[in-house]
């Protein structure tokens, strides 16, 4: 993924929602995601100036696959956050039937994806009624369910928020990604 080197970030966000284009380093998986979109290695992801986007009190919602869990935890630390919990578990259904979707997996056939919650400072939870499970059909490759944004809004409130690696513009959210017109510019930290 090409990233511009110059940037100026003046707005701070209380909520950062990210679905990184993870590059898999294992030979059996290489190329799967690359067939659909450009991917980034962990060092490239860690170099993004996400810490400069974060407000003093900020919640990060970060999608991770189970094979990339160590990298996701490293990324959380590199961006200046502390891991708290798994915010959401997406249980995937097939597109055209109510049956479960199963990917290839490593040892077992995979289904779920997780969205990790990490914090910087002391963001406040606005609702204790937000549930962790999301049961939703798969859509285009790697696209996450739209309802996640609504759950984040219910959990955190109507705060300044940005979606990184976005594929669509959602009202109330600033976005950054290579598949849409971005509201902000990010570049690697030097």
Regions found by a protein language model. Name each.
Residues 1-190:
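Class I S-adenosyl-L-methionine-dependent methyltransferase catalytic core
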């Amino acid at each position: 993924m090409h990233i511009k080197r110059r940037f100026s970030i003046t707005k701070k966000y209380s909520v950062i929602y990210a679905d990184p284009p993870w590059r898999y380093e294992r030979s059996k998986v290489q190329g799967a995601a690359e067939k659909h979109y450009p991917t980034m290695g962990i060092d490239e992801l860690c170099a993004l100036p996400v810490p400069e986007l974060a407000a003093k009190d900020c919640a990060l919602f970060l999608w991770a696959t189970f094979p990339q869990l160590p990298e996701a935890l490293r990324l959380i630390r590199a961006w200046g956050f502390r891991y708290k919990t798994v915010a959401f578990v997406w249980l995937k259904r097939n597109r055209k039937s109510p049956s479960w979707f199963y990917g290839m997996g490593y040892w077992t056939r995979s289904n779920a994806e997780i969205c990790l919650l990490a914090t910087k400072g002391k963001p406040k939870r606005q609702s204790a009624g937000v549930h962790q499970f999301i049961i939703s059909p798969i859509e285009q490759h790697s696209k996450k369910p739209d309802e996640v944004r609504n759950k984040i809004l219910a959990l955190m409130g109507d705060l300044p928020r940005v979606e990184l690696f976005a594929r669509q513009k959602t009202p109330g959210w600033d976005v950054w990604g290579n598949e849409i017109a971005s509201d902000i510019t990010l570049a690697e930290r030097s």
